[in-house]
Every structure is written in structure tokens, then in C-alpha cells.
Amino acid sequence: MVTAHLVQRYGAETVRGWYFEVWNEPDIDYWHGTPEQYWELYDRAVAGVRAALPGAKVGGPATTGPGELKAYKFLDDFLTHVTAAKVPLDFISFHAKGRPQIQGGEVVMGLAKELNDVDKGFEIVARHKMNKLPIILSEADPEGCAACSMKVNPANAYRNGTLYPSYTAAAYKGLFELADRHKVNLLSMLSWSFEFEGKDYFEGFRSLSTNGIDKPVLNFFRMAALMNGRRVSVSSSGQLKLDDIIASGVRNAPDIDAFATADARQAAVMLWNYHDAEKAGPSAPASVTVTGLPKTASRVRLTHYRIDDSHSNAYTLWKAMGSPQNPSAAQIAELKSKDGLQLLESPRWIDAKGGAVQISTDLPHHAISLLQIDW
């Protein structure tokens, strides 16, 4: 009845583009039945949805992170079931979470755990020879409790400043590399973020804004939205090996790495200086060489966006104001002037030689730059 109602309200063509996930985290207490009873639920749900809308996309099982044995076995057994029973499965979903902690009075992120969850999940999918099926990481986050503020868990203070966006940049690069390694079809990863109304400013909930003030992490997603075309290869002398990050995180040297895309008229390079530890660290000089530009492009326009302590960051300004919980209209206006995605410098034209350009910048600890090159 639900699917039929949705079709009636929104139209079959629209609803056919949606992804129906049958349950949430049935491997833990959100599901009170046995795994076999979940298989039956899934089978009946697929039949019901498809009866109301032939061609609808239905999938799952939206388990917790497969880095844990129980979740690993549930996902593995579910894929065995749908194969043996020949039940339709249009996409595979599971969750991946990091594990931030307080160490020595400072937040230390747990990137290794999130990437390990994904590594194990992709391994299961590949072993079942379901490489072409879309995979949706329907929750991919630095930890598991969106509604736990830093008053509940002090480690969740990471959500306010530059640690969150730089973590997300490094994590997403790892997710794509793992998809390449296992030769699976990663369709999307979702940030399980919400709106929390009536709460303090920068209370540390997993949200993209706080009382109408955008957080730096939202500017990471704004940066990512500006990257067009296809992913292209990147190498960095400062990047850490993926296997080392999965094994032990980013605990010693920082991860100075990048992600790039290109289309017929633009190239974009996102680069970051990431470390699991919140505590202050050194800046990193970065020299970026972009090759493969059209030989006819003798001059290109560089637009340089930045997230750091003084750009695209209302949190540091709010702290400088004395962390007001009842900011004045003037203070709110000033915070809004800093909460959007900001340029590090005015756009400028630079010379390209032989289809290549070189750009130098300095990346502060936990900073992210987006270099957008148009021709």
C-alpha cells in the first residue's frame, strides 16, 4: 500500500528512480527476529513493492559495519540467500563507521575502522560475484551516533571544525580506492546527518549546520559538488598507503593527498592535510602539477577555494566572539559571512605550458583546498 500511495502521489517514473531499502541494521536490535525471518521479510517486501511498481529498485540489507563479525556474517548470509532463492536484488547496502576517542584530552579520529568496514564489505560482495550491482553505503560516517552531542560524548566535538571535513575527504578517497581494488560498483555514500532544533550553537551534533549557521563540513560537500566529469589519477609524495591507514589510521605522519576530476572544459583537484589527531600540527607546502590539459589552452583560470581556520569556517569566528549562545543580530550576520565556501584568493589566469600547469600553496593542519582550473 505504501508503494502504491507513493506512485499515486509522485508518479511511477519518479518513484522508479528511488531506492527502497527494506530495513535498517537488521543484524542488531533494530530487528527482533532471526536472520531467516529477515530473509522472509525481504522476499515479501520485494514482491510487494514490485507488484505495486514493476521495475522498482529494492535492496539491502543495510547492516552495520562488516568489520564486526556478526555484521559480516549477516551480509554474507543475506547475499547467499538471495542468490539461492533467486530473489531480486537491485542494490547492496551496508554501513561504515569510524571511532573517534578522547586521548590526552584531545579528539583522535578512527578512520581505520570506517575503511576496514568498507574493505570487508566490498570483499564479501566481490566473493559473491556481485561486482556489477550498485553498492550504497547508506550510512558512512566518522562514528555511529548522530544524535549524541559532545555533551554526551566529548569526542564528538570533532563535528564543529576542520577535523570533520578533512576526515571526510581522506575517507572518501579511501572508499573509491577500495572500490577500485575489489572491482565493485560503489554508487554512493550517505552522511547520516540531521537537523537538531532547539539545541545550543555548535553543541556537537552530527549536522551540517547549527541554528542556521553552516559548519565547515558542509563546505566540503560544496567543494565536492564543484568537481565535474570523471575521476582521474592522482599521486602524492605525502600520501599514506591505504593498507597502512586501514591497519593503524593516520597517527604519525599526516596524510597529504588529493582527489581529482576532469571534463572537456575543467579540471579540479581537491587536496588536504589530514591527521587523526585534533591537536595542532604543522602546515604542509604543496606543489601541484596538473597535466593532460588541451595543448591549445595556453592560459587557464585558477579558482582556489579553501577550508581552514580562517576560511569557510564560522566555528573559529564564533569561538573568537566568546562562544555566544544568544548571538546578536550583528554577530549572526558576521557568522553568516564566514559560513559559506570561500576563496583563498581572487580567481586569476595562469600560463599553461605543454598541457600542464603548476600551482603552489601552503596547506595548514586539517585544511582542504579545491583548485578549479577552467579553459
Give the ranges of each region predicted by the language model.
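Noncatalytic carbohydrate-binding groove/subsite architecture in carbohydrate-active enzymes
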Residues: 35-200, 206, 240-247
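Substrate-binding clefts and catalytic carboxylate motifs of secreted carbohydrate-active enzymes
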Residues: 149-161, 170-195, 294-345
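Carbohydrate-binding surface patches
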Residues: 244-322, 360-370
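Glycan-recognition and catalytic regions of carbohydrate-active enzymes
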Residues: 182-188, 192, 197-198, 206-266, ...
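Surface-exposed acidic, glycine-flexible loop patches that form ligand/cofactor-binding
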Residues: 8-14, 51, 83-85, 126-128, ...
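C-terminal beta-strand-rich structural cap/linker in extracellular carbohydrate-active enzymes
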Residues: 326-375
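Active-site mouth of glycoside hydrolases
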Residues: 1-30, 62-69
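Active-site proximal loops enriched in glycine and acidic residues that flank catalytic Cys/His/Asp
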Residues: 139, 193, 236, 271-273, ...
